Amino acid sequence: YKFYNNPNALGLGMVSSPSIEDVTLSEDNPFENQNMVFNALAGTTKEYFTKIPVINSEMENVSTSQLTDGHTKYFPTDTSIAECHIDYVVKMDKDSYLYMYLPTKYERSCNVWIQDEDDYIDGSEPMEYAGQFFVGDNYSIMNLGKFYEGQELRIRITVANDDNEAYWKDQLFYTFDYDSFAQTCADMQKNVLEVTSFEDTYLEGTVNSENDGSVLFTTIPYENGWTITVNGKKVTAEKSLDSLITIPLEQGENKITMKFSPDYWKVSLIITGFGVALLVLIFLFEYKRGKVMKKVLAKANFTAESSEKATTPVINDTNDT
């Protein structure tokens, strides 16, 4: 096994401006989602991910049609020809990794290829296979490699599935400003939650807030059943990004306690208690009924024996003289 230290890790919780509670995520652009989230957390207005435009596009044996929901359908013009691809040419704005994402609701497998534009024009080398896109685990942001500022790259997407079709709303290519991201992480690491106690359903820690009105943004999923206190006072957690717990803070040092008891746990205790009480009542009822039955049976036996004695004839044994 190999273990790697992440120098940019922010831990279980970090101090944030309350604007994180107002962030609404887009369904179609994960790059801008990350920009919005990180800027809200850090109180910055930076472009950590920067979109680079497509400066040229070409298609071979491809026809298109527009769907009413904003998707474009790509399919072979002539199905007897095996090749069917779309090329996008982009120019790097900085030394960076290049990332690609094609938003869609209709996943159809495609193959992705990449090549330096000068090499493509020269024709001396074949395109490099970058991987498969869409379908299952392959439908995510794709890292196409690390390139340098000013470099032009050709990205080819080939329709490669039995349906002979592909759909996407847009073609997104982004670079990443790692240095700016790392510096922001270093600043945020100064005000993260220091966990002092941790159990399956309990967490305790401290965090310092420089400003009044700040919140603690956590990576803990929001769910009913949490009891949270800040400096001994019970508080109500908010939900951020439609999924994660956010806790209001006071200016200065904050001692946080979080205890989880799911709603069904209380219900199950009530049901269990009712069941136990019912069993006790049944036992007592059966116990008392058993004593009564013994008396009834004893009386019945006594009556039967008395009746038997009363009806049995008495034979007198006399001798004739």
PLM feature segments, named:
Residues 1-31, 115-117:
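Aromatic/acidic, Gly/Pro-rich catalytic loop(s) in extracytoplasmic/lumenal soluble domains
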Residues 6-8, 38, 227:
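Short, flexible coil/turn micro-motifs enriched in small/turn-prone residues
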Residues 8, 41, 172, 256, ...:
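Intrinsic disorder/low-complexity detector
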Residues 16-67:
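Extracellular carbohydrate-recognition regions
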Residues 31-33, 54, 252, 299, ...:
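Intrinsically disordered, low-complexity peptide-like regions
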Residues 45-305:
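Active-site-proximal, structured, solvent-exposed surfaces of multi-pass membrane proteins
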Residues 297-321:
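Solvent-exposed, low-complexity, intrinsically disordered
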